[in-house]
UniProtKB/Swiss-Prot annotation:
Gene: argJ
EC numbers for this chain: 2.3.1.35, 2.3.1.1
A family per Pfam: ArgJ
InterPro entries for this protein: Arg_biosynth_ArgJ (IPR002813), ArgJ-like_dom_sf (IPR016117), ArgJ_beta_C (IPR042195)
Protein's pathway: Amino-acid biosynthesis; L-arginine biosynthesis; L-ornithine and N-acetyl-L-glutamate from L-glutamate and N(2)-acetyl-L-ornithine (cyclic): step 1/1; Amino-acid biosynthesis; L-arginine biosynthesis; N(2)-acetyl-L-ornithine from L-glutamate: step 1/4
Biological process per Gene Ontology, one example term: L-arginine biosynthetic process
Organism of origin: Burkholderia pseudomallei (strain K96243)
Residue numbers marked as site, Involved in the stabilization of negative charge on the oxyanion by the formation of the oxyanion hole: T123, G124
GO-annotated cellular components: cytoplasm
Subunit text: Heterotetramer of two alpha and two beta chains.
UniProtKB keywords: Acyltransferase, Amino-acid biosynthesis, Arginine biosynthesis, Autocatalytic cleavage, Cytoplasm, Multifunctional enzyme, Transferase
Official protein name in the record: Arginine biosynthesis bifunctional protein ArgJ
Main localization category: cytoplasm
Keyword set includes Flavoprotein: no
List of residues binding substrate: T160, K186, T197, E284, N408, S413
């Protein structure tokens, strides 16, 4: 059950000039469901992406990296993305790579572009051959129904164990020019930073130089999709793609030092964070949405390290599910996070506005009923004060329920 998942009105997902989306039902794994997505990008756009750090990365991730490397070396720009659900094309060896390249070649043939101008993506079951003929057979239909307003359908077409489609959109003004941003994401399990079994596609109509877009993609991922965790597993397929169509009247953003870049970065990060948080709210079996903030560190990295130790802990997550204020589990996670020279005698722990631990020990004024009150909420904030610096970091996570086990035990049935 999704946690306070906002209602998404398809009419509020703004079309992005220069970007069209089409879908098909190709029976990749299950019949009568959208499972192929094609995104077409007009000539002149720039595209960038960041991908999983899992060494067992899926075949389409390898091909995406190859094609983007050619673009950065001066090759023709990306003109299309193709996504299939139901099969990850991971753990499939050389045949999987051949299938990813064959998918690009077939879409390129149908669209009149070069295979190197296509980025492929897959999500679903690992270690099973991609049903390439079914995927290829679905491409003509996906191309035929492309439209600029198909963002909600596109969000549905990339779902796996997601219970709801995930999309976000906004318009901002930069230097007097209107910029439109719309994105979709998918993911509900195998969610951990760097990134997860997560796909995210975010388009906007600003014109951005390739090196600047590359920097923006990494920066935005680090402040959004790399700040979420559901179960601590890092997937083979995770990908986050930025598309800058260049159709807006705003002059090209050619430097990361410009005020226009700062404004765009803020807007893109806001949309990406919304998409990332939707993934956590729809986490497999999730009943609670939890924000973990660690403050007073020597660096943002050590703050994030502690935040993730809390967010990954099965004991912490099951305590949240049970509404059990067994909050010593949080202190234990802080202690094993691996931060050197951590003085636990300086640490304060808050649960929402309730001071649970002060100077490394139980707050004498803390009452368990106060902790119980917070633990029963569907949204909870954990705040840790380290008392050793000015850095901070925030992550978003969820609880761990019986349903998480059931969903993953039944995943292939």
């Amino acid at each position: 059950m999704a946690v306070n998942f906002p209602s998404i009105d398809p009419a509020q997902l703004h079309p992005v000039a220069g970007v069209t989306l089409g879908w098909a039902e190709a029976n990749i794994r299950k019949p009568n469901r959208k499972d192929v997505l094609v995104v077409s990008v007009e000539e002149g756009a720039t595209v960038s992406g960041v991908f999983t750090e899992n060494r067992f990365c899926a075949a389409p991730v390898t091909v995406c990296r190859e094609h983007l490397a050619k673009v950065r070396a001066g090759g023709a720009g990306i003109r299309a993305l193709v996504v299939n659900t139901g099969n990850a094309n991971a753990g499939t060896g050389e045949p999987g790579l051949a299938h990813a390249r064959e998918t690009c070649a077939e879409l390129a043939r149908l669209a009149g572009i070069a295979p190197g101008q296509v980025l492929p993506f897959s999500t679903g079951v690992i270690l099973e051959p991609l049903p390439i003929e079914r995927l290829k057979a679905g491409l003509p239909a996906a191309l035929a129904n492309r439209a600029a307003a198909n963002w909600h359908d596109a969000a549905q077409a990339i779902m796996t164990t997601d219970t709801l489609p995930k999309a976000a959109s906004r318009q901002v003004t930069i230097d007097g020019h209107t910029i439109t941003l719309t994105g979709i994401s998918k993911g509900a399990g195998m969610i951990k930073p760097n990134m997860a079994t997560m796909l995210g596609f975010l388009a906007f109509d600003a014109k951005v130089a390739q090196p600047v877009l590359d920097a923006l993609a990494k920066d935005v991922a680090d402040h959004s999709f790399n700040c979420i965790t559901i179960d601590g597993d890092t997937s083979t397929n995770d990908s986050f793609i930025l598309i800058a169509s260049g159709k807006a009247s705003l002059p090209q953003i050619a430097s990361t030092d410009s005020p226009a870049y700062a404004a765009l970065r803020e807007a893109v990060t806001a949309v990406a964070q919304a998409l990332a948080q939707l993934i956590v709210r729809d986490g497999e079996g999730a009943t609670k949405f939890i924000t973990v903030t660690v403050e007073g560190g020597k660096s943002a990295a050590e703050c994030r390290q502690i935040a993730y130790a809390i967010g990954h802990s099965p004991l912490v997550k099951t305590a949240f599910y049970a509404s059990d204020p067994n909050l010593g589990r949080i202190l234990a996670a802080i202690g094993y996070a691996g931060v050197a020279d951590l003085d636990v005698g300086k640490i304060d722990l808050y649960l929402d506005d309730v001071l649970v631990a002060k100077a490394g020990g139980r707050n004498p004024a803390y009452l368990e009923e106060d902790g119980q009150r917070v633990m029963k909420q569907s949204e909870i904030a954990v705040r840790v004060l380290l008392g050793r610096g000015d850095a901070q970091a925030t992550i978003w996570t969820c609880d761990l329920s019986h349903d998480y086990v059931s969903i993953n035990a039944d995943y292939r049935s």
